Swiss-Prot record:
Annotated InterPro entries: OxStress_Response_Reg
Chain residue ranges for the region called Kinase-inducible domain (KID): 203-230
Listed name of the protein: Protein OXIDATIVE STRESS 3 LIKE 6
Location in the cell: Nucleus
A Gene Ontology term for the protein's cellular component: nucleus
Organism superkingdom: Eukaryota
Alphabetical keyword list: Nucleus, Stress response, Transcription, Transcription regulation
Region (Disordered) location: 46-90
One of the protein's GO biological processes: response to oxidative stress
Function: Probable transcription factor. Promotes slightly the tolerance to cadmium (Cd) and to oxidizing chemicals (e.g. diamide).
PANTHER family found in the cross-reference section: OS08G0516900 PROTEIN, PROTEIN OXIDATIVE STRESS 3 LIKE 6
Organism, as annotated: Arabidopsis thaliana
Motif Nuclear localization signal positions after renumbering to this chain: 143-151
Compositional bias annotation for Acidic residues: 75-86
Length: 245
């Protein structure tokens, strides 16, 4: 009994037989096989035993490359999805923060609801001019009357009260926009009478008038709008008086 190791295919078969998938028959067949030869006088009849293995272990290089590329693509897709989720979360937080910030701004709160949802963009100025009338808000007569009443009250209060009393000393931030002066008619008539009587003393009278005018300006100014220029003018007036004496 002899044991021989060889191929399961005969010599007459083609060395390379390919099926419709493009895989050779030798790749599918088992490379080793067992042959038993009987020497009992039959002239060496051979019995071939062939074993085939599954085709899962033997794959073409194209299939292996496709599987590896698919694995790489899946990992890349997962990374892109994670990045998209992170970006969407950041956008959501930024949008919520910006909306809350706009609501808290005084400009946003001061706008009227009449202009909500009416913002438009125009490429032609003629169209914007024609449609601007539609965006105009009709003034409420009650609000207009209220503003007029408040303005009249402030005007009457300003007439009845002097500048020094109207702007309190306790509030240093309150200051008039312009320097207010309240001329006194009685003092003006008295100075005119004195000027007519004393024609010879014109220079002295002018100096006295300038000093009186400077004192009135100082009295009209408040502590918050008290400036150094007024002090310098007062010092200059005192210096002139000392020189005359």
């Amino acid at each position: 009994m002899e044991v021989m190791v060889g191929s399961s295919f005969g010599i007459g078969m083609a060395a390379y037989v390919r099926d419709h998938r493009g895989v050779s028959a030798q790749d599918k067949a088992v490379q080793t096989a067992l042959f038993l030869a009987d020497e009992s006088g039959r002239g060496g009849s051979q019995i071939g035993i062939g074993l085939r293995m599954s085709n899962n272990n033997n794959k073409s290089p194209e299939e292996s490359s496709d599987s590896s590329s698919s694995i790489g693509e899946s990992s890349e897709n997962e990374e892109e999805e994670e990045e998209d989720d992170a970006v969407s979360c950041q956008r959501g937080t930024l949008d919520s923060f910006s909306s809350s910030l706009e609501d808290s701004l005084p400009i946003k709160r001061g706008l009227s609801n009449h202009y909500v949802g009416k913002s438009k963009s125009f490429g032609n100025l003629m169209e914007a001019a024609s449609k601007a009338k539609d965006l105009e808000k009709v003034e409420n007569p009650f609000n207009k009357r209220r503003r007029l009443v408040i303005a009249n009250k402030l005007r009457r209060r300003g007439r009845s009260m002097s500048a020094s009393n109207f702007y309190s000393w306790q509030n240093p931030n309150s200051m008039p926009l312009l320097a207010l002066q309240e001329p006194n008619e009685e003092d003006h008539h008295i100075h005119n009478d004195d000027y007519e009587d004393d024609d010879g003393d014109g220079d002295d009278h002018r100096k006295i008038m300038m000093m009186m005018k400077n004192k009135k300006e100082l009295m009209a100014q408040t502590r918050s709008c008290f400036c150094l220029s007024s002090l310098q003018e007062e010092d200059d007036g005192d210096g002139d008086d000392d020189e005359d004496e």
